[in-house]
Amino acid sequence: MQHPPLDSIRNIGIISHIDAGKTTVSERILFYTGETHKIGEVHDGEAVMDWMPQEQERGITITSTATVCRWGAWWINLIDTPGHIDFTIEVERSLRALDGAVAIFSAVEGVQPQSESVWRQADRYQVPRICFINKMDRVGADYRETLRQMEEKLGARPVLLQLPVGVEASFAGVVDLIAGEFLTFSEADQGSTVERHPIPAEIAGEAMAVREELIEAAADFDDAILADFLEGTAIAAERIRAAIRKGTIACRIVPVFLGTALRNRGIQPLLDAVAAYLPSPRDIPPVTGQRPDGEAVDSLPCDPAGPLCALAFKVQADEGRKLTYLRIYSGTVKAGGALWNSNRGCFEKAARLFRMHAHKREPIDEALAGDIVAAIGLKEVLTGDTLCDPAHKVLLSGLTVPEPVVALAVEPRGVDDRDKLLPALEKLQWEDPTFRVHEDEETGQTILTGMGELHLEVVTDRLGREFGVQVKTGRPQVVYRETITRPAERQEVFRTEFEGKVQGGEVHLRLAPLHRGEGVRIVVPPAEVLGITRELHTALTESLTRGASTGCVTGYPLTDLEVRVITVPVEQGVTTEGGVRAAAGRGLMRAARDGAPTLLEPLMDLEIITPTEYAGKVLGSVQQKRGRVEGIITQGNTEAIRALVPLAEMFGYMTELRSATKGRGGFTMEFSRFDQAPASVLQQFGLA
């Protein structure tokens, strides 16, 4: 493929709640752009974008998948992301690298919990979005209710650019409100032919009224449109589109489109909208970062001739090597070229470059600013690392990585498995920053931690399939957090004798509790203020950071406390880096013990969908689980129950809910926050 002009590139992601139809939409995009010659269906396990065996068997997306397709003059780098909360890091890192997104909502279920979560992630990275309300052919489809929920739950300003013709089973197509046409999609060729007709008389009045609302929204971004609208002057379609594009890129409005991907209706207008309203790499603000000395650098515009700056937003294990996905923000990467890894402080070599088509690869010689590509040969790289020109070193901000909340003990089944287990787990950790591994000091067991039961279930399944490692697993356990309840202070002195010479370190620490959700704040004054060398300063900071990952009583990570370094007395000929590390680590643990430690447990935002006849039984179950009901919404013959529930009470809940609702209920949940654990839990750890 010849490299396209920057203005014609669209780097986009598909985001939504699980089962809203992301992958079904992605498969139609590939088909209508000519990248595939057959539509792969998720329910048949044939989706091109869901290529992992676990995805095909479960009918869900587990890992974000990248591909490239052409739509007219436009070049679309497309990433399909998971909708299940356990794989939220896949959404996080994709949004970090993308310029725009298509948010998919079900016209039946509306804005669901994980939809809210991914929307907040997109807000955090200021990613412009358009919206596709899917499943318009389903019984109970109500796009107006979905629009209302977008406003209420997401704080979005949706702008309707289409109207449906027909509802539920009679859904026939959409009215393009800007062009003033009724669009249908031929069933004879799986929707490939888009036919244009006059707007049906029965909805012409509604179409005119909604078009006026659309023009009013466009007028917020073009004063001339407002003047012409008030004077009754005709406004050209291209002027309206330009104004809508301006508002979309500014993240002030969200254009909304309608359709049913499974029935092959509405995808081509969505592709037109990707080209018309979502930004090119040139439209997004220039990337900024820091120099190695901490000073801010000038912004780096998206220019292939500029200094190289790229983000490694995903690392995947590939036959023992690392396959690294790169977003090129500035400059050019050549196959075989040397790069500087700002996070690891070392040179790397991109031996080979590829354009990815799901799990298939197209070798390329170079990648330019605006590209999303993959590289083999980067040995030290991890997710979130910055790769740049050695002559223009820069460090970009990394990713927001959520902390794991579920733990699982594993042990190898046989001797051969024991030798292969840790190397396999290391490779899986390359891929997933939310997956952690450690050894229980008391039992010697290998402990896996992750975002949920499904997350760890997929990990153990991959151990067997991809690495040939068979393991026995324990029951999932909650990952608690330790914190302190009162201030504490410690002057820690460490001394040891090595080859007849006394060595050591001394650190004065002050700890204070923080509000819930503030995490760990480590305050270390600059080296010159403390009167220590840069090497001692680094040793001190690293020791405190490492120490905070292990609590003083239970071994669970510390959270919601401030660790402040007051002084670091230096004794000439005695103070060493190792001594300072030991004093800092031991001082932190002892100070935390003096701070009246306690445990925090993870609380989950839970949404249960149940037939009304079983709602009473379900509510009783939630209350028995120490849950706090926060809202109940009636939707026809079903109830949507929202509650805050401790994760410890939720293991195996799907089986319980199915039994209570005769298989008709379902639920979703996502992490909310850590809060005080009850006395029964504290007693287990000797803290009550």
Swiss-Prot record:
PANTHER family (UniProt xref): RIBOSOME-RELEASING FACTOR 2, MITOCHONDRIAL, TRANSLATION ELONGATION FACTOR G-RELATED
Keyword Methyltransferase: no
Domain tr-type G: 7-282
Provenance organism: Geobacter metallireducens (strain ATCC 53774 / DSM 7210 / GS-15)
Gene Ontology molecular function, alphabetical: GTP binding; GTPase activity; translation elongation factor activity
Domain of life: Bacteria
Keywords linked to the UniProt accession: Cytoplasm, Elongation factor, GTP-binding, Nucleotide-binding, Protein biosynthesis
Gene3D superfamilies (alphabetical): 3.30.230.10, 3.30.70.240, Elongation Factor G (Translational Gtpase), domain 3, P-loop containing nucleotide triphosphate hydrolases, Translation factors
Residues reported in the UniProt entry to bind GTP: 16-23, 80-84, 134-137
Recorded family membership: Belongs to the TRAFAC class translation factor GTPase superfamily. Classic translation factor GTPase family. EF-G/EF-2 subfamily.
Name of the molecule in the record: Elongation factor G 2
